[in-house]
Swiss-Prot record:
Transmembrane segments: none annotated. It catalyses: Couples ATP hydrolysis with the unwinding of duplex DNA by translocating in the 3'-5' direction; ATP + H2O = ADP + phosphate + H(+). DNA topoisomerase 3 (topA) inhibits helicase activity on Holliday junctions (HJ) but has no effect on ATPase activity. It comes from Saccharolobus solfataricus (strain ATCC 35092 / DSM 1617 / JCM 11322 / P2) (Sulfolobus solfataricus). This is ATP-dependent helicase Lhr-Core. It is an enzyme of class 5 (isomerase). Residues 39-230 form the Helicase ATP-binding domain. PROSITE patterns: HELICASE_ATP_BIND_1, HELICASE_CTER. A motif (DEIH box) lies at residues 173-176. One of its GO terms (molecular function) is ATP binding.
Amino acid sequence: MSNTYFYSDEEIYNLLRPYVAKWFRQKYTTFTPPQRAAIPLIKQNYNVLVSSPTGSGKTLAAFLGILDSLFELGDNNELEDKVYAIYISPLRALNNDMQRNLLEPLNELRQVNSKLPDVRVGIRTSDTTPYEKQKMLKKPPHILITTPESFGISITSPKFSQKLTDVKWIIVDEIHELANSKRGAYLSAMLELFRNLITKKEFVRIGLSATVSPLEEVAQFLVGKDREYRIVDARFVKPVDIKVISPVKDLVHSSESEVDKGIYKTILNEVKKHRTTLIFTNTRHATERVAYKLRKLAENEKVFDVDAIEAHHSSLSRDVRLDVEEKLKKGILKVVVSSTSLELGIDIGYIDLVILLSSPKSVSRLLQRIGRAGHHIRSISKGRVIVVDRDDLVECSVLAKLARDRKIDSIHIPKNPLDVLSQIIVSASLISPIDRDDLFKILRRSYNFSDLSESDYSLVLRYLSGDFFGVELKNVYAKIRIKEEKIIYPKKGSRLIFYTNSGTIPDEAMISVVTENNRYVGNLEEEFVEILSPGDIFVLSGRTYEFIGSKGSKVIVKEAMGQRPTVPSWFSEMLPLAYESALEIGKFRREIAEMIKKGVTHNEIIESISKEYEIDKHASMSIYTYILEQYLFTNGKVPSDNLILIEIYDDEEGIRNYIFHALYGRRALDALSRAFAYVVSEELDTDVRVSVTDNGFALSVKRDVPFDYNIKSLFEKITPDNVYDIVTRAVMRTEMLKRRFRHCAERSFMILRRYKGRETNLERRELNSEILLKAIREIGNFPVMKETIREILEDHMDILRAKEILKKIASQEIKVDVFGPTNIPSPFSHSIILKGHSDVVLAEDRRELLKKLHERVVEFLRQKGVNIELEYTSV
């Protein structure tokens, strides 16, 4: 923020037309920090990234200068029938908000100036009717509101694109949400096509973002290569009040009913003190459960109207979600429970408290969620984080401190997605025939494709030309023609294929589950199926099943009565802990362990935690005793940011578990766990079950492992140089590869979601995908397969960070130690071991299992001469 210059009110008023300045003075009295910095920059035609919290006025910061410039044109009779500004957002709901938010000031300005020029605002999305689109051709809006996908289609439209040739400003809202996905790559490349093939001149790019980091990279994503930009850093202009709350004094010995009672008592106490409360959970299932329990409580205790409690998540119909949003705006609701669907800046009116149930897994998400409270620049964003266990308590305490200290984790921006590249090449050919070398230069100005290799580009051109297929199939799969090996033309039919199949969001599929004798069991979401491996146990309709495999859109299982689930049904929905946040949690563990080692007293350590992390003494004691138990149990080996501890635990079912305690973010751990499992499986010629959490991962094998098997030697066999290849081999036969291949094939127009205007059958697409996948395995360097592997390793996992960790291990910056074998798991391993239990047993029983594991730890320490219960009471 120190590099951001904030202009005075008078300086900005002097830049505006008198009647615009008068209207603003009457309505707002003063400019907000993002407005003070951004409006003058936009008036000076700078590319600008504005990063500030919800309710800080960044939307008006973007539009006020633009409206003023359009009024100037109108006052001079120079306002023509063409589009001057385009607003692009990831959500259609945001687009509807934006239209309302622009029409309101236009109507108010008309009261200040009766001769106000008629500035038109219009929406063009997939919901826009052909009639409305036709009207736009005759009388286009001066400000066009759209989505990335509709923008891509608009610039390839021969007629409508002619109305866009003089666009002066493009605003990208919620840019942080777009930048970390393939939708962002699509938009980034489309903006380059727009600049070079439609406007043929530069336009002002304005990015609006919530709290995000690093700002420099997001700004480069916005403007592309070799363009100047300015950053308005107003991320921390709103005061934030964050508190982490433990629902009970003792998270270990309290029963599940006591913890549950404590959670809802805390929620009710907070809700009573506030007008409107927004509660975030981490899964849709939890959202429904919390909303249901709150309704029951409200009914029993008569504290507020049952109808004033609603749930809001992506599985609900659009009409239901819109109804909830409308009730929120009108102030009818007391409580709304959501998963991730209300994180973005949809206008939901007045919220004065946000409650987070459990960790949001990253600092940026914590700030974004809490930022929904106090929807005004001078309001305090008030957030309460309620934890559910000791791991959650440690994690949330560290995340809250990082948020207060303004340390935000980095965004991940996908690089060189070849399926998106396929769409961009087809769209470029539809705008006009283009020289392949010229298009390559244009594409490399996009941040996402700035280091696109000539070989990958040629590979995708060959694929789109049908060169990978025999003569009989060439015409079926080709989407372009390249004349004289130079000029790219669209193939007949490509325009309709592009219009009906472009975009990057895959269709969500429900997969039928059947037994080996074809008895129907139920349905699973595709994102859950993709994390399954043969032998995995999961729960469906209250019964346990073993996953055998899949065929097309069917999952084949067999009953697994009495077996412990290895994958909880909600796990695919769980957000992964961010890398930087994980490192900070590891650092915190290390610092407490060092204090214990130095002999710092219990009370001093607890006092230090309370003061530095702003939590109460009971929560501090829970954290301290948790780390103390691990320290005493493992003889001082507390896994941290610079220590990976491999714990060898032999369980009661005859399974040897190699538990890797490692805090480096779940995406990196996902990659490492698959590499290690693959090598162990190859070396021991046995099946290896993998379980990954945010705090580490476990490799489980049958007990007949050679007694002297050196698990630590894996770090010599898996290196920064070979880990990419090993993980690639590991994922080649997974469900994830099958599912992601279909998504990439659909994005690459190899499998069509819509053909000749009609929706194609999903089951047929699944089968086609399987057939193609088998055939393509034989083709070397096939771009769709190459992209599938890249997406899994770089976007879903974090292979780059996995390499970084292995480098640090090789240089001894990160140490690796081994503990065990033992038949009692260490305190830190309990959550990893019990990962699947939440589906097969009641939560009450799961907590009882945790208590029993804890009792075994206490007994183990007692045998070592340490009475941990006395340690507690001495505090």
